[in-house]
Amino acid sequence: MTTQASTKQPDVLVIGGGNAALCAALMAAEAGATVLMLEAAPREWRGGNSGHTRNLRCMHEAPQDVLVEAYPEEEYWQDLLKVTGGITNEKLARLVIRASSTCRDWMRKHGVHFQPPLSGALHVARTNAFFMGGGKALVNAYYRSAEKLGVQIRYNAPVDKLDIKEGRFVAAYVGEERITAKTCVLAAGGFESNREWLREAWGQNERGEWPADNFLIRGTQFNQGVLLKHMLAHGADRIGDPTQAHMVAIDARAPLYD
């Protein structure tokens, strides 16, 4: 079957279990490749931070199914500039913005449902398409589709290190187990859950305090940045500002990880 099964060398090894990993696995399987996906979390916590999302911001030049009015490319781009403070890659950003207009058909093909516009909520129904059942339903739909397409999925399988020779992927290690593949997709998330790395990125304030010590992680506990740090050690280029984040106000009594 698909879960926790042994496998011959796959065409594609996908490391991660959230939205990006699932999309990569689904598209590889659609193209006829054999796929093995390694998810660090147990099955009940699968999906990374994608389980905490609820909608997709979509460009559209005219009303589209669950979207009202219009949300053109340039307005979307200007909104992105506001929230990033201008620290973004315009070429890649515009690629994503344009694709947001058409990706819902592919998502529906893999079992994702969108809820109709809510009465009195036109300000978000114009820009955002909401997943029926939220991010957890999105993740579950993709996992069901992946299993139907023959993607092998292993849970509780955190990758500790990669074997990289001359800039090329050779193998991944889950503990002492060595897993080879013809190609590898790294989609294992950032370092949002790594308190030590967050401290390093945010530093100390003028009172000598560490702001990151007060952070509560609205998301998975499994995004430790292990492979990100591994790739940086192997010469991968850094990009972006490590202090950029999507932050929200939550109850101070909330657990460290949600």
Go through each PLM region and give its residues.
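Beta1/beta-strand and adjacent pyrophosphate-binding region of the FAD-binding site
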Residues: 5-20, 36
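Core beta-strand elements of the Rossmann-like FAD/NAD(P) dinucleotide-binding domain
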Residues: 7-10, 174-183
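Short glycine/serine/threonine-rich phosphate/pyrophosphate-binding segments
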Residues: 21-24, 194-195
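Generic hydrophobic/aromatic pocket-lining and core-packing "Φ" positions
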Residues: 24-25, 104, 228
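Aromatic pocket-lining residues of Rossmann-like dinucleotide-binding sites
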Residues: 28
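Conserved N-terminal/central alpha/beta ligand/cofactor-binding core
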Residues: 34, 40-152, 158-161, 197-200, ...
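Short, hydrophobic/aromatic-rich segments at coil-to-beta transitions
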Residues: 166-172
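Glycine-rich loop(s) and the adjacent beta-strand/alpha-helix scaffold that form part
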Residues: 179-254
